[in-house]
Amino acid sequence: MSQSNQPDSPVTQTQAEEAVRTLLRWAGEDPTREGLLDTPRRVAEAYGDWFSGYRDEPREYLERTFEEVAGYDELIVLRDISYESHCEHHMAPIIGKVHVGYLPRGKVVGISKLARVVESYARRFQVQEKMTAQIAQCIQDVLQPLGVGVVVEGAHECMTTRGIHKRGVSMVTSKMLGSFREDARTRAEFLQFIEVGGKR
């Protein structure tokens, strides 16, 4: 978490559990009844998992690279990276997939590291557009490739379980940097590789 986003003092597990009890009472429940006695602890632990990205520095995952790639200088694409996030407006789940591509400039990174970058940004309160840009910019800043493309698909529970109640709707966002933005052929090749919403 960046320094500017940190609270003045860390919130304890006990304080987090008490906040859950307050929400239960606000909803009209009795947090002392048997079925809810362990709920505050369980919710706090679940939040610790769901928002573990705040304890990560995504750039560190990309620092170990491989420069001996036998002159490989073509597109590298990792598609269908599943993710789970939560929208910062309603704290409702966002579930979807991320597709990442980059055109290396002399060095590549292990593919699991790209997935870890996605996971690190997803496990925070997010806006999909922002998350898309964060993933792309992180890869561009650390690997300094010729270009980066990121496409994110997301189903937003804040739209399906409340408000307009529209199911089966998927939001798609993209961020193109470098050659992916400037060269239509590179961009088209990337989009053909991932075929968002199409048959594979």
UniProtKB/Swiss-Prot annotation:
Give the catalysed reaction(s), semicolon-separated.
GTP + H2O = 7,8-dihydroneopterin 3'-triphosphate + formate + H(+)
Under the heading SUPFAM superfamilies, the entry gives: Tetrahydrobiopterin biosynthesis enzymes-like
Decide whether keyword Nucleotide-binding is in the record: yes
Record-listed Zn(2+) binding positions: C87, H90, C158
| MF terms (GO), sorted A to Z | GTP binding; GTP cyclohydrolase I activity; zinc ion binding
Instruction: Look up the EC number in the record and give it.
Output: 3.5.4.16
* Family per similarity comment: Belongs to the GTP cyclohydrolase I family.
Per its record, how is this protein called by name?
GTP cyclohydrolase 1
Its lineage opens with: Bacteria, Pseudomonadati, Pseudomonadota, Gammaproteobacteria, Lysobacterales
